[in-house]
From Swiss-Prot:
<dbReference type="GO" id="GO:0000049">
    <property type="term" value="F:tRNA binding"/>
</dbReference>
<dbReference type="InterPro" id="IPR018163">
    <property type="entry name" value="Thr/Ala-tRNA-synth_IIc_edit"/>
</dbReference>
<comment type="similarity">
    <text>Belongs to the class-II aminoacyl-tRNA synthetase family.</text>
</comment>
<feature type="binding site">
    <location>
        <position position="679"/>
    </location>
    <ligand>
        <name>Zn(2+)</name>
    </ligand>
</feature>
<feature type="binding site">
    <location>
        <position position="675"/>
    </location>
    <ligand>
        <name>Zn(2+)</name>
    </ligand>
</feature>
<keyword id="KW-0547">Nucleotide-binding</keyword>
<dbReference type="GO" id="GO:0008270">
    <property type="term" value="F:zinc ion binding"/>
</dbReference>
<feature type="region of interest" description="Disordered">
    <location>
        <begin position="852"/>
        <end position="871"/>
    </location>
</feature>
<dbReference type="InterPro" id="IPR018164">
    <property type="entry name" value="Ala-tRNA-synth_IIc_N"/>
</dbReference>
<dbReference type="InterPro" id="IPR003156">
    <property type="entry name" value="DHHA1_dom"/>
</dbReference>
<dbReference type="InterPro" id="IPR045864">
    <property type="entry name" value="aa-tRNA-synth_II/BPL/LPL"/>
</dbReference>
<keyword id="KW-0030">Aminoacyl-tRNA synthetase</keyword>
<protein>
    <recommendedName>
        <fullName>Alanine--tRNA ligase</fullName>
        <ecNumber>6.1.1.7</ecNumber>
    </recommendedName>
</protein>
<keyword id="KW-0479">Metal-binding</keyword>
<dbReference type="InterPro" id="IPR050058">
    <property type="entry name" value="Ala-tRNA_ligase"/>
</dbReference>
<dbReference type="InterPro" id="IPR018165">
    <property type="entry name" value="Ala-tRNA-synth_IIc_core"/>
</dbReference>
<dbReference type="Pfam" id="PF02272">
    <property type="entry name" value="DHHA1"/>
</dbReference>
Amino acid sequence: MAGVNEIRSKYLEFFRAQGHEVVASGPLVPNNDPTLLFTNAGMVPFKNVFTGQETRPYKRAASSQKCVRAGGKHNDLDNVGYTARHHTFFEMLGNFSFGDYYKAEAIEFAWDLITKELALPESRLMVTIYEDDDEAHGLWKKITGLSDDKIVRLGAKSNFWQMGDTGPCGPNSEIFYDHGDKIPGGPPGSPDEDGDRFIEIWNLVFMQYEQHEDGSRTRLPKPSIDTGMGLERIAAVLQGTHDNYSTDLMRSLIVASAEASKSDPDGPHAVSHRVIADHLRSSSFLLADGVMPSNEGRGYVLRRIMRRAMRHAQLVGVAEPLMWRLVPALVRQMGDAYPELRRAEALVTETLRLEETRFRETLTRGLKLLDEEIESLGGKGVLAGEVAFKLYDTYGFPLDLTQDALRSRGMSVDQTGFDEAMAKQRQDARAAWSGSGEKATEAVWFELRDKVGATEFLGYESEIAEGKVVALLVDGQPVDKVEAGTDAALITNQTPFYAESGGQVGDTGIVFSADGAEFPVIDTMKKLGALHVHIGKLARGTLKLGDIVEMKVDKSLRDATRANHSATHLLHEALRRVLGDHVTQKGSMVGPERLRFDFSHPKPMTPEEISEVETIVNRVIRQNAEVTTRLMTPEDAIAAGALALFGEKYGEEVRVLAMGLDDENPNGTYSVELCGGTHVRRVGDIAIFKIVSESAVASGIRRIEALTGEGARAYLVAQDRIAKEAASALRISTEDLPARVVSLMEERKRLERELAQAKKQLAMSGGGGSGGQESPVQEFGGVKLIARKLEGVNPKDLRGLIDESKKQLGSGVVVLVAISEDGKGAIAVGVTDDLTSRYNAVELVKAGAAAMGGKGGGGRPDMAQAGGPEAEKADAALDAVKAAVGELAGAA
């Protein structure tokens, strides 16, 4: 029986032998289509090739593409675990022709692979075609020998494929496998086609038309082929099961979940193990591709998936985080086919562990609220939308998690009510938003780009250049001229000013004309990826369209920014070497004063790791090697070892920066990255690198702030001065300073403990007041009572003092009011065990707390405590408890 990994390899090798380029899977976050949440089909990485916007050095390709469907139009999340074929993560096998072969070859390849390489019996196969595609009908009969009843004509809904409202489109053929009459269901096109007997295993799309805006279609000059075969589906067929979760790969993950939770994989929690197995795959691959859990966008979808799996882990009865313990099992199964998963194993493991640990407590509280609401409904009916929204807003419960919890009880959610609550929150948020301050609309920038074209950037070679004024804007609107004293935006045909992008701030400087106009530039922005927009206020003279101007970048600030930007490249590589290959850049800010670098890592760096990173970067800086730049295609650059930043969009040609020398690297270079920013000429120009902070930005994302050059030198001088001043004040050497600080901290803690103990002793001996009574012990109806007001005592010490007082009394009631040094009040009541049937400490403490402006109080019948914001009413609180005790004593 062929395993999933063997089937994947066999598919790719078959098409390699047919002259196809075997292309590695693209990332789950598509870098060529901002409209897609995740890559959800095998053709997504090739979309621009099909439309002609991109060319590749091959005309035939085959791939096994990672896909996720868990949000937006394609959302399988709710059904995962309950059905045989729904997944959030799946692999799509595909072969593609870009104007090379067409229908005949596509059908022949598919039939040969299925019937010869995979050895499926022809008697179990049937196909569908588009109802008007006589050509496909003839080819299927000729190539396969299928009878007419095995070639089913269907309408456009199922057998005509379109990329969108416009663009390439065409008929498609689907190949179905018949599981046999022991499984209910009918053939495609029949009334009961939704049964499980006939399963689609391969879809062949024949792209032969161009769809136009008016609805008309014209034939493409070079028709293409796009096919897709779900690996999980074909594996199920080849392994003799109609359930994808019974295949060897999925079964291994289900068994791993069951073993880790000490439960039966096929018992009452079978659905939960299926959910965990599926969601482990999607969560792990999304994390490996750079998506981190968050409260918006792709990160929120990831968090929904993770939390749904975590809720099912709780249903199984696992008390500790589970998913992170299953990552090694997943890597064993899929790490060879997808090396990025193996590289990111540490990041995936730690992120899952942290996310589940944080969610556990919230999950418990949220489920308690949900159980209470279900109980109030008698365990049936519809949960109110506002309750579902509260679970979402307060406890982080995605709606589908709540729906999933209700599903097993036969209940549902008021979706309309939930949507209304969500809409109200968004409306409130919009009302509170003051706006971005952006004056020029996007329409203006589009018009200008079409009119004047892209700005040519000359700043790599020089900080000074001549330009022609091609656009002026005041208050976001184009004008013909600008007078002195006016805030304006200036666009020239070419510029040495770097526009803010890639994390690097825009250049500043000055622009002036021959007739005396001076325009100080305070910022440079990039619009539509093409226009360099210089922002400032005209200091003198007049600027007009068509003027020739001299443009000078502030060289000192540019040089400082260069150093910081180059340092981020050295830092990135050092982090990967010290922490692991899972480190990827998640954001940066590079300015003249400092640099900020955000990166994926699941936990704080240790002081030793920070020191090692600094050492590596400064060692490379001291080499003073030349920084080299080459222009290449993105594909060639990455193939040559350049590091591309996740999520960054690259054009047809990119700058490849190589920095530093490294004997360990095959090409002898320390760092190679794609980057369009400005950089130093030699790494020695950075001078020195110093990390000043390392902190958390979000779950799984850390931030380093650092200084270079003069900024780093000034920082070190200041730190040295502070250390020397502190050492001088303590009359020790700077070398002894750390040990002395530790000693002083320990001494302070000891003195604080002694002071607290002395205060308690003083208070209990009567020095802290006793509520106006000379003797601390009073009697009410034969019941002894101690009532004290304790000044300067920490409320957290009340429990111990209550216990001591109860021992002193033997039998009775104790009430203590503590007033801490910050003026906050707290009251505690203790009742000895022999009296708890008559006096309840919780009820007594509520009476005292109310007198001090407090509400409630919690504890046990023998000990209870509450807060009291009005500490000045401490005596009244003591009197209130005395009165309550007196009443109960009298009643007895």
